[in-house]
Structures are given as C-alpha cells and as structure tokens.
C-alpha cells in the first residue's frame, strides 16, 4: 500500500479523505491531555502583572524600610504603575471582547510556560526594578526622572502606542468573521 510521511493533518473540521488520506492501515494519534481555552490562557497570563504590580508597589516601601532603605514612591514610579495596570487591563478586556481565536484550545500544561513571561518578566522583574529606592522621590529629585513635562511626553507616546495597538486588534478582529477560523491579510 501507500506509505505516508508522519506529518500533522491540518483541518480539524475536515474528513480524512478531504485531506488526501486514503487506504491507510495505521493512523497515529497524539493525546495532548486536558485542554484549556485560549481566552482563559490570555486572561491568566495578563492577570499576573495585574496582581503582582500592586503587591510590589504597595509593599516595596515597607520591605525596603525593614532593610534600612526607607523611600517614598516618586511621580515616575506612580506613573509607571498606572501605565502598567492600564496596559494589562486593556489586554484583559481585549481578550474578552475583541480577540477571535482560530484554535479553541491548547494543552493545559502549556499555561505555565505561556504565563512565565508575563508573571516573571512583566510582573516581578519590571515591578521589582521600578518600585525600588533607586527611583524613589529622593533618588530622582533634580533629575530628568523628576521632570513632569518629560514624563508626560512619554505618557503621551505610550498612549498613542496603546491606541495604535488597539486599532490593530480591531482591524484583525474585523478580518475574521465571528465564529469562524478564517484568516485574512489586512
């Protein structure tokens, strides 16, 4: 009989014969285990920084004071906190109301790997670095990091970037009719 290479068959809703598989004696299947929806994956990923940043922002002055480094949060630190929270809240809302997923699920065991970037890098590393005495009120006094006009300029750039990103997500959403897996090029 015919010999087929071991390759994934693309097209979940298609019959094997529609994919060119005929007269096959053996079909190999792989159990990917429990599945989790992509929407849930994104919600869990983006929830990390939304939980971690407030904990660090509120807890850092208390923690550093215990080690003899009391400080108060500066305007730049508070601004970063607000922008990070707004960014990830936007991502959560987009996951619920904007994103349309081509695949319904992914293996549940991948959620830890997928969340590592957001929870560790965007959560702990960013939060731990920004909300420390090195950017506190006393440390930035008299520097450009204490210049409100300078900071507001970058807040405006951030806002324009977020709006551009939102526009891109809306464009992509409109390219995929609801309830389909259609992929189109903008």
Language model: regions and residue ranges:
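Short, small-residue-biased leader/transition segments that mark boundaries at the very start
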Residues: 3-4
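Alpha-helical transmembrane segments in multi-pass membrane proteins
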Residues: 30-119
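Short, structural beta-strand-to-alpha-helix junction motif
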Residues: 9-21, 107
